[in-house]
């Protein structure tokens, strides 16, 4: 197995959720909100004792009295003090492990700034005193989880969307495309269109209700114009949703107008290309020899790709953009909300991977820049 006595940990840090657990497991042991909450008022502070902050689901449940911060914005860590609190909570409260005993695989967004990678390495090996660590790009791990090493991954989570072409296990940075539109933006957009219809969703608690409506009732239309016509002429697409207070609301074309923004960001006033176009552009930026393999291995991953109908729509849109002779295959694994974590679990438990770890000793000899030599 490995040179380390204890099982490796796998920690996938997303803008919305932290997924953490043990290498070799099928699913993450802990999944919780990537948030840190602090009291808005001094009186609430006094009730909390010395800690002065809450992390994860506890912060989420007390959101009425707390000011919530997301240390990961659009996939990138922007608040290191809060991120450290989240990691501390992950190891000690969620996984109940001593981090100094476990090598740990962390995930990162594509095109993560060099300084960020070094800072992650430093915190793991110095602050948490880990025996070893490694950092892997999220999209690459999702591809591994699907049983592939070459393909293009469309990863859309809570904070950001990327199209990442990968050849033989290595991401191709010049061809990576990024779209600042993901799950959180879709929730905001659904709130907006429901408010325009006369419903009132304003508070953070009401935002959670809208997120639930999005996750339970929204879907991607194969043909948006046709679907709009159907919704206008009949009630066949309408669904009822019961609010916590017992009131029942009817959701019609909002069901597919909300996720349509992934294909038409202009709905939200963005000038960006849609997910099908960034996927195609990314493929076109790659060498002509590997394009065929990318078209045939198009993997969807992340929570914002869970909408029913999204794979069929991607198939239709990319077929329209690609050369007519090209075989297009869209792969949408049912477990894609956790594909990144699953890929990390597979990778960190491979016997061939054990030489890849950055050991504490190597770190002490070379410093944080070792991350660029060993993780790419």
Curated annotation (Swiss-Prot):
Keyword set, alphabetical order: ATP-binding, Cytoplasm, Cytoskeleton, Hydrolase, Nucleotide-binding, Oxidation
Keyword ATP-binding: yes
InterPro entries named in the record: Actin, Actin/actin-like_CS, Actin_CS, ATPase_NBD
Cell location: Cytoplasm, Cytoskeleton
Keyword ATP-binding: yes
Catalyzed reaction equations: ATP + H2O = ADP + phosphate + H(+)
Subunit annotation: Polymerization of globular actin (G-actin) leads to a structural filament (F-actin) in the form of a two-stranded helix. Each actin can bind to 4 others.
Protein name, UniProt field: Actin, alpha anomalous
Species for this entry: Takifugu rubripes (Japanese pufferfish)
């Amino acid at each position: 197995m490995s040179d380390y006595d204890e099982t490796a940990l796998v920690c996938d840090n997303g803008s919305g959720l932290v997924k953490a657990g043990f290498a070799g497991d099928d699913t993450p042991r802990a999944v919780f909100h990537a948030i840190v909450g602090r009291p808005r008022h001094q009186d609430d502070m006094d009730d909390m004792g010395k800690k002065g902050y809450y992390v994860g689901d506890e912060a989420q449940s007390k959101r009425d009295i707390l000011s919530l911060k997301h240390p990961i914005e659009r996939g990138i860590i922007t608040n290191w003090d809060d991120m450290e609190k989240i990691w501390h909570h992950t190891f000690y409260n969620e996984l109940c492990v001593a981090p100094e005993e476990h090598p740990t695989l962390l995930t990162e967004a594509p095109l993560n700034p060099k300084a960020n990678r070094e800072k992650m390495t430093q915190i793991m090996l110095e602050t948490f005193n880990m025996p070893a660590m490694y950092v892997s790009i999220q999209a690459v791990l999702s591809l591994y989880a699907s049983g592939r090493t070459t393909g293009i991954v469309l990863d859309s989570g809570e904070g950001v969307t990327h199209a990442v072409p990968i050849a033989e296990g290595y991401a191709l940075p010049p061809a990576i495309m990024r779209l600042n539109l993901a799950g959180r933006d879709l929730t905001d957009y659904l709130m907006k269109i429901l408010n325009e219809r006369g419903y009132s969703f304003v508070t953070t608690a009401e935002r959670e209700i809208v997120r639930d409506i999005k996750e339970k009732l929204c879907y991607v239309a194969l043909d948006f114009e046709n679907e709009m016509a159907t919704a206008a002429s009949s009630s066949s697409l309408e669904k009822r949703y019961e609010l916590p207070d017992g009131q029942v609301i009817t959701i019609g074309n909002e069901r597919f107008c909300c996720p349509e923004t992934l294909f038409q960001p202009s709905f939200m006033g963005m000038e960006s290309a849609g997910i099908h176009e960034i996927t195609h552009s990314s493929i076109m930026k790659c060498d002509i020899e590997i394009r065929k393999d990318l078209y045939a291995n198009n993997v969807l991953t992340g929570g914002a790709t869970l909408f029913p109908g999204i794979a069929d729509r991607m198939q239709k849109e990319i077929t329209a953009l690609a050369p007519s002779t090209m075989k297009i295959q869209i792969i949408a694994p049912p477990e894609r909300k956790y594909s990144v974590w699953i890929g990390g679990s597979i990778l960190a438990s491979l016997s061939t991977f054990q030489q890849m770890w950055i050991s504490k000793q190597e770190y002490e000899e070379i410093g944080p820049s070792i991350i660029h030599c060993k993780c790419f």
